[in-house]
A protein has these predicted regions:
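N-terminal "arm"/small-domain region of PLP-dependent enzymes with the aminotransferase-like
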Residues: 39-97, 105
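Conserved N-terminal alpha-helix of the aminotransferase class I/II PLP-enzyme fold
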Residues: 75-127, 149-156
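Substrate-binding/gating loop at the entrance of the active-site cleft, primarily
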Residues: 120-121, 142-159, 196, 224-228
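Conserved PLP-anchoring active-site segment centered on the Schiff-base-forming lysine
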Residues: 132-150, 169
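Active-site phosphate-binding strand-loop segment of PLP-dependent enzymes
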Residues: 170-226, 246
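Short beta-strand-to-turn element immediately C-terminal to the catalytic PLP-Schiff-base lysine
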Residues: 233, 257-260
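Active-site PLP-lysine loop of aminotransferase-like
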Residues: 241-254, 263
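Single conserved hydrophobic/aromatic residue that forms the stacking wall/gate
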Residues: 261-269
Length: 269
């Protein structure tokens, strides 16, 4: 994506998002097709069933599970273009896999986002969202009522990397939020409904303050899921999920997701 305030997602992370966002790819590309089938104008039930994947003639009716670590190409030149980020395509499933991309597109549709990525866990999604915005010397403003693992991630793990944080109440006033900002603040973070306190974040106010300071708002939407709340509609720029919880629903799979909204981001700031 193009933005005068290009805060985040560089190198490979940027490339993966750009694959799904850039208009210059051919209309026959997988990424273009995924974007076409985000289906923002459809109801939630239809998105849950159909978004992110549309089979062609003779192709699998359901999203196929691609169980391969790597992908074959006919020439080393083809592979070289992939490694140099000059061409789109798959080459290593740790970075990108068709199954994951289709599921990510479905989640982007459900949230009303532009694109999404799957991660190995919800904490991985939060770390990816925050660490690709911040670097050593930067500052985060975060809600104090968040999942304990995320609180530890921000207050302990990221502190070891030179990234500091100020925690504020999820129902803080506009004046209190503004007071938490520093010249080096790069992002705001909160949870729609906190785990486990169940406090509710004032997303609209957090987004307003974040954008006035020219930074994006990241919201963890794990508890409500997009069926019940879509933070992007209230001003969030990035949405994360621990799909381990309600999205999986069976306690059988650990996973996460990171979703991006850009029009541009953050919100014409």
């Amino acid at each position: 994506f193009a933005s005068s305030r290009c805060y985040f997602y560089k190198k490979m992370i940027l490339y993966l998002y750009v694959n799904a966002l850039c208009e210059h790819f051919s209309t026959g590309s997988l990424f273009y097709q995924m974007r076409r089938h985000i289906m923002n104008n459809y109801r939630m039930g239809t998105k849950c069933v159909q978004a992110g994947y549309k089979p062609g003639n003779g192709e699998p009716r359901q999203i196929p599970i691609i169980q391969s670590t790597t992908f074959k190409y006919d020439t080393s030149e083809d592979m070289g273009k992939l490694f140099d980020l000059e061409a789109e395509g798959y080459f290593y499933s740790r970075l990108q896999n068709p199954t994951c991309d289709h599921v990510a597109a479905k989640l982007a549709s459900m949230e009303g986002g532009t694109a999404a990525m799957l991660t190995s866990s919800g904490q991985a999604a939060n770390f990816m969202a925050l660490f690709n915005i911040c670097e050593c010397g930067d500052h985060i403003v975060a809600s104090s009522s968040i999942y304990g693992g995320t609180f530890n991630l921000i207050s302990v793990t990221m502190a070891k990397m030179g990234i500091t944080a100020t925690f504020v109440s999820p129902d803080a006033t506009e004046e209190e939020l503004n007071a938490a900002f520093k010249p080096n603040t790069k992002v705001m973070f909160g949870e729609t409904i906190a785990n486990p306190a169940l406090t509710v974040l004032d997303i609209e106010l957090f987004a307003k303050v974040a954008h006035e300071h020219g930074v994006p708002l990241v919201v963890d939407n794990t508890f409500p899921t997009p069926v019940n709340c879509r933070p992007i509609e209230w001003g969030a720029d990035i949405v994360t999920h621990s799909t381990t919880k309600y999205m999986d629903g069976h306690g059988a799979a650990v996973g996460g997701a990171c979703l991006l909204y850009t029009s541009p981001s953050p919100r014409d700031a």
